[in-house]
Amino acid sequence: MNIANIKLPEEWQLDLYKKEKISKLKSDRDNKEVEPIKYNGFLYDYDSKARERINAAIIALDDMGAGSRINWTTYNNYDVLVTANDLRKIIANVAIRSNKLHTVYRLAKEKVEQATTKEEVDKITLEL
């Protein structure tokens, strides 16, 4: 018997479809978490390398003393002066965005789990 010719019961097909959708929603959420973040009118990178640089810069700026600034290249290649507090606020903005994304993901996941048709599943997105 060729396994490719086996037809799963409709309920199983829907369950698999839901699992795929939830996996895609999670991937979308994770990708949005590392998108550039807006602060003071500029976009800042927030991938793993950028996070390391931001954290190192905060330490350096704190060590340099109150009011210290460094030149920072934004996502769009603008050079701006930032303080340790600016960099902390960027991290805070990311935390707020991350919380929203996780909340929206959980709600979308619940909707997928409650859906009774593939069409219902297809309509579900991460809406911020």
Q: Could you tell me what each predicted segment is?
A:
Residues 1-128:
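A preference for well-ordered globular domain cores
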